[in-house]
Structures are given as structure tokens and as C-alpha cells.
From Swiss-Prot:
Annotated Basic residues bias: 64-77
Region span, Disordered: 63-93
UniProt keyword Ribonucleoprotein, yes or no: yes
Protein's name according to its UniProt entry: Large ribosomal subunit protein uL4
Any one GO molecular-function label of the UniProt entry: structural constituent of ribosome
One biological process term in Gene Ontology: translation
Keywords assigned: Ribonucleoprotein, Ribosomal protein, RNA-binding, rRNA-binding
Subunit description: Part of the 50S ribosomal subunit.
GO CC list: ribonucleoprotein complex; ribosome
InterPro entries named among the record's database cross-references: Ribosomal_uL4 (IPR002136), Ribosomal_uL4-like (IPR013005), Ribosomal_uL4_dom_sf (IPR023574)
Chain's role: One of the primary rRNA binding proteins, this protein initially binds near the 5'-end of the 23S rRNA. It is important during the early stages of 50S assembly. It makes multiple contacts with different domains of the 23S rRNA in the assembled 50S subunit and ribosome.
Length: 206
């Protein structure tokens, strides 16, 4: 499929052909959901912790004698049913990460790119270069292109002025092409690719 290439000023700068093997798949939500779940589980901190009955600071002595009180036969006040006792089966510090085959991850990225193209939410820019590191000027250029909520993917290196100017614009993320991922594609409205990013993606999935 051919898309018109735009400049930051909003002018046309030719056309680019997008590969059907990357951008032309019928999006499968199940594969995309698997990749997003894998990404979010991998970044989860996992530092949750509740003290069990062996860890709470409380006496280990028997609460009261075994017989003669008419009450239930309790021993430790650390048992979960008591106020101040340990939590039964509480959260422990652990990693939430799980495995996902590389082929499924790659397929998920292609399906996410295809979903964006199908929704007509991909814009290809000629180059990501700013003359000066001024947020106001770049924000104006983005507004004229309709980029109020966007993920911008550049080549292997993002030009420094562009990176500095873009980092204070709300709801706009800028990543090099090697950082492209399914979750960030889906959480932003528009996906903006530089010509270098398109070439790198086609080389990657060749």
C-alpha cells in the first residue's frame, strides 16, 4: 500500500510503499493481547509483600491454657484469623515475567502495525529534524499535522534537537526504531514513522 510522505511543515514529499507482509495483515486481537500482557507483566515491579504468621512480630506463647476455659483450642496469636496475625497466602516478592516465543512477539508487532494502518492512523514523515530545540515550534508543527496524541518512531538515532523539543509535549512519545513495541503503539492515537523507520522495519521483517 502506498502512503503520502509528509514534511513537518505539512507539505507532500513523495510516496512510500508499505509492505503487505508487515502492514497488510488482518489484525488478530488475541495475538496483540498476548504481547501486551507479556510486556506489562515483564515491567511489573513485583515488590508486593505481606507478612505471614512466621514473620509477624508477636509472642509465640500459647494464648491461654488448652482446657477449662470453654473457649476454642487456640495456640498462636499469630494465626491469620486474629487481629495482628499473619496474612494467609499473602503476596510475596516475585517476578511476574513469563515467556513468550520470539515469533509471537514479532507477529504481534506486525499485527499492531497492520491495525494502525487499517484504522488510517499511520503518518509517514520525511525526516525527524528540528532546526532548534524549541518545544513551542515543534508543538505547533505537530498541531498542524493533527498530532495531539502520537507515538513517533525515528531511525536508529533520534536527532538531538528534535528529541529535546519533543520531550515536553504531552501525550507524544518519541522512540528510535529499535524501541518500537506493541503496547506503546496501541496506547497512543497516531503512529508516526519516519522514512528511515519504515526502511528499518522492512529490513527487520524481511
Amino acid at each position: 500500500m502506498d502512503l503520502t510522505v509528509k514534511t513537518l511543515e505539512g507539505k507532500d514529499a513523495g510516496k512510500v510503499s508499505l509492505s503487505d507482509a508487515i502492514f497488510g495483515l488482518e489484525p488478530r486481537e488475541d495475538i496483540i493481547a498476548r504481547v501486551v500482557r507479556w510486556q506489562l507483566a515483564k515491567r511489573q515491579q513485583g515488590t508486593h509483600k505481606a507478612k505471614g504468621r512466621a514473620e509477624v512480630a508477636r509472642t509465640g506463647a500459647k494464648m491461654y491454657k488448652q482446657k477449662g476455659t470453654g473457649r476454642a483450642r487456640h495456640h498462636s496469636a499469630r494465626a491469620p484469623q486474629f487481629r495482628g496475625g499473619g496474612k494467609a497466602h499473602g503476596p510475596v516478592v516475585r517476578s511476574h515475567a513469563h515467556d513468550l516465543p520470539k515469533k509471537v512477539r514479532a507477529l504481534g508487532l506486525r499485527h499492531a502495525l497492520s491495525a494502525k494502518l487499517k484504522a488510517e492512523e499511520i503518518i509517514v514523515l520525511d525526516d525527524l529534524v528540528a532546526n532548534e530545540a524549541k518545544t513551542k515550534a515543534l508543538a505547533g508543527a505537530f498541531a498542524s499535522l493533527g498530532l495531539t496524541n502520537a507515538l513517533i518512531i525515528g531511525g536508529a538515532e533520534i536527532e538531538n534537537n528534535f528529541k529535546l523539543a519533543a520531550q515536553n509535549i504531552p501525550n507524544v512519545d518519541v522512540l528510535p526504531v529499535q524501541g518500537i513495541n506493541v503496547y506503546d503503539i496501541l496506547r497512543r492515537g497516531k503512529l508516526v514513522l519516519s522514512k528511515a523507520a519504515v526502511e528499518a522495519l522492512e529490513e527487520r521483517f524481511k
